[in-house]
Amino acid sequence: YIDTYVENIRDIVPFLHNNRYVDKVEEKMEVAEKEGKSKYTYLSDLEVIYHFVHLQKDMDEKKNRKADTKKSYISEILSFCQCMVQHAEEFELNGEEVQKKDSLLKTLQPWHIRKYNSWLKQVENGRNGETYAVATLAKKAVLIRSFLKHLHVFAYIEKPLHEELQRANVNEQDRPNRDLSYDEVMKILGFYKERGHLVNYTILLSLASTGARIQELCTTRVKDLHYDGKYWLKVTGKGDKVRELFISEYLYQCICEMRRRRGFQTVLDRGDESPLFVNQRGNFYNSKTLSNQVTDMIKKTNLEFLQYRENPVTAHTFRHAFAIMAVEQGNADLYHLMQTLGHENIQTTKIYLEKHMKRKNNVGTSFADMLV
């Protein structure tokens, strides 16, 4: 039975992604309420996962979970369930009990969560076959804890299982080194410029010179680009917050040439809904696909400084590079940098500069080279 449970989960993924069934699930909840029972009485495991993922907490639709966030939630929760099933013997999970209750989630006990916790810390599912990074553990723990707490609040499970899941606090030393200097950025850009690879060059230049998130660039349309003494690009960031990115004259020309080579003219038109950054098929780039492509672009340069880095240079690394260059080359203050990057909290902006500033302010750099 426990094996068919996993198969059923895999088959039902399209259902979990579709928000059309919210009303039907809530009708079942209403029936239970009218009978004086808890809301989740008549729901199955999959339905409670569905309701948790699609739960609307705000009357303003823009403030509720976005599609990508929902996908991430579904993926993590299903991984949690599949882990429980695949390691049932190790976790001492009783398959007969699961069948009797027709529910995995209602069968879970505190010791199952503690064993899952130990497994999560040791499993080699991370980058390069290593254990998960602390930041990844923190993300998984926060999400599963939130889900288990939700099940307890809605009385689907009796025990507060979320209290058994250990926290994974991310300290400064746990964060990957995403610093990238001006010289390193120029070496990467120079590699593709010298080889005349305009598309790769334009994408990397766009990331480095605007500080944009890759998803922001992938969703921009021609109508979002306008000229007001300088070129400005309107992007929609996290939380649907809109801000403008400065586009240099040189970057604008590169974007125009990239579009021209792919069969598109660039006329600033507020009614043009077509993508600004067009892929080979003339469509919007998929942000995850492009993000992977950017990582590959960097690897293929085989630049010497990349061999000594602990972590690969990714699209996100260029946001850190932008922050460092803004402070080093442009003397930007923290508040203006926060606004430009679209950070909600200035602490996030500080994290971007943390390692760089500690190295820059290390007093040893002022005299140690003289000790020869």
Task: Name each model-derived stretch.
Residues 186-214, 241:
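Basic, Lys/Arg- and aromatic-enriched nucleic-acid-binding interface segment
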Residues 239, 341-366:
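Catalytic-site neighborhood detector that most strongly recognizes the C-terminal catalytic loop/helix
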